[in-house]
Amino acid sequence: MAQTLQMEIPNFGNSILECLNEQRLQGLYCDVSVVVKGHAFKAHRAVLAASSSYFRDLFNSSRSAVVELPAAVQPQSFQQILTFCYTGRLSMNMGDQFLLIYTAGFLQIQEIMEKGTEFFLKVSSPSCDSQGLHPEEAPSSEPQSPVAQILGWPACSTPLPLVSRVKTEQELDSVQCTPMAKRLWDSSQKEAGGSGGNNGSRKMAKFSTPDLAPNRMPQPVSVATATAAVAVVAVGGCVSGPSMSERTSPGTSSAYTSDSPSSYHNEEDEEEDAGEEGTDEQYRQICNMYTMYSMLNVGQTVEKVEALPEQVVLESHSRIRVRQDLASLPAELINQIGNRCHPKLYDEGDPSEKLELVTGTNVYITRAQLMNCHVSAGTRHKVLLRRLLASFFDRNTLANSCGTGIRSSTNDPRRKPLDSRVLHAVKYYCQNFAPNFKESEMNAIAADMCTNARRVVRKSWLPKTKPLHLVEGDNYSSFISDTGKIEPDMMSMEHSFETASHDGEAGPSAEVLQ
């Protein structure tokens, strides 16, 4: 029997993918162009189909050389995910990790969805350590991005041979997150001297697509694609639209910036950042994507979550603030915040009507509660987040919680994180209201609310504290019970003693008289 010889070349598959990526960056041997909002990305069908179920179904139903993705997908996030398909690595700005997660859900890339979610949650926390972050490799070992190549940055002009440098990859299951050293919008902020505030619109390099066919083929959607898991693309600041400043003039204050009666937090003056005005159509698109993304949880029963019933709260000035149940948002408030609220708030309706905060989350809040949150917050997105969290979680729940679930060494291990579905819905709604609202800021505010709630609850316990000698242990309580049993005998003895003493007092006087 002939012997079989076997030879294995380590990391040969990685080197092939690396060479394919270099060919893609140079536009060599690419057989498909993916168009995202006018930006064209050349790629290989085989690599896309092997990485994404979305593209696999799409290529099975169409042989077109040009594929156009829906408008909800952002070019920057798709570029990063396309690089991941070739290299298995992600590189992004801090704060954009959830945008990538949701885009990966739309493209049905399960590796990012399954392995990256927990990792990105840790990275987005303000208390996370740096163990999960890997420094960027040298520029020579990292393939260039299409944006860099088109802008004329140095790049190889000739295709590299297949026997190219080999990267030593880590574990197949690991997900690397290499934060960029500089953000694309940092330079413009420094030039402006920081006076203009944070701009919600992410600045991306735009490049032309001369190789595109003049007539783009409409994207066919199969049944499997339509029912596939799709994710939200708005978290991280993807809602685009005409920018609008939230900052009021120095001499004018917003008419809708009063504090909520249910708020027990110490709220100082918060800076109001510039936001973006999202249209109803964009809101519906993103909500539809969230609905399809929720279908990832197949076989799981999603319970309906509703906001807490509103209660009239006594304030420190011994007066009751009466809330007005409005049928629709006031015109003055609409002029200030634009179309960034729930679409149904702009039409008149029953104040007790239950509105789904974000389509597909099964998290409901009454029209009156949501409207009062907006009226109280005005243009301040941080206050809006506090109002919404206070609408869903009462004081005791917040006090007994560890916030977003990211613990520090000083946290009580008995504290449980808040309901993740409610947190995600509230965060997403606030992200739609203010696209530049970062995930790390939201986590910090939620943790601060839990801390403040614990302080208030602790103060309410102080007057009811028992003296130390009353909580000594079982011996003292058993002694109390025993003394309770002998109390009648002691009373009878005391009564007889008093009688004897009186008789004793009368005795000598009688003897003297005699």
Swiss-Prot record:
Keywords: Cytoplasm, Isopeptide bond, Nucleus, Phosphoprotein, Repressor, Transcription, Transcription regulation, Ubl conjugation. CDD domains: BTB_POZ_BTBD14B_NAC1 (cd18290). GO terms for molecular function: DNA-binding transcription factor activity, RNA polymerase II-specific; RNA polymerase II cis-regulatory region sequence-specific DNA binding. Its main location: nucleus. Induction: Expression is increased by cocaine, selectively in the nucleus accumbens. mRNA is present at increased levels in the nucleus accumbens 3 weeks after withdrawal from cocaine self-administration. Residues 360-457 form the BEN domain. It is found in: Nucleus; Cytoplasm. PROSITE patterns: BEN, BTB. The modification Phosphoserine is found at S187, S245, S492, S496. This is Nucleus accumbens-associated protein 1. There is a cross-link at K167 (Glycyl lysine isopeptide (Lys-Gly) (interchain with G-Cter in SUMO1)). There is a cross-link at K167, K182, K304, K438, K466, K485 (Glycyl lysine isopeptide (Lys-Gly) (interchain with G-Cter in SUMO2)). Homooligomer; mediated by the BTB domain. Both isoforms interact with HDAC3 and HDAC4. Interacts (via BTB domain) with CUL3, PSMD7 and RCOR1. Residues 242-251 have a biased composition (Polar residues). It comes from Rattus norvegicus. It comes from the Eukaryota. Highly expressed in the hippocampus, brain cortex, cerebellum and brainstem. Expressed in the nucleus accumbens, olfactory tubercle, the striatum, frontal and parietal cortex and ventral pallidum. Weakly expressed in the heart, liver, kidney, spleen, testis, and skeletal muscle. Isoform 2 is expressed in the brain and liver, less abundantly expressed in the brain than isoform 1. It holds the Pfam family BEN. Functions as a transcriptional repressor. Isoform 1 is a stronger transcriptional repressor than isoform 2. Seems to function as a transcriptional corepressor in neuronal cells through recruitment of HDAC3 and HDAC4. Contributes to tumor progression, and tumor cell proliferation and survival. This may be mediated at least in part through repressing transcriptional activity of GADD45GIP1. Required for recruiting the proteasome from the nucleus to the cytoplasm and dendritic spines. GO terms for biological process: negative regulation of DNA-templated transcription; positive regulation of cell population proliferation; regulation of transcription by RNA polymerase II.
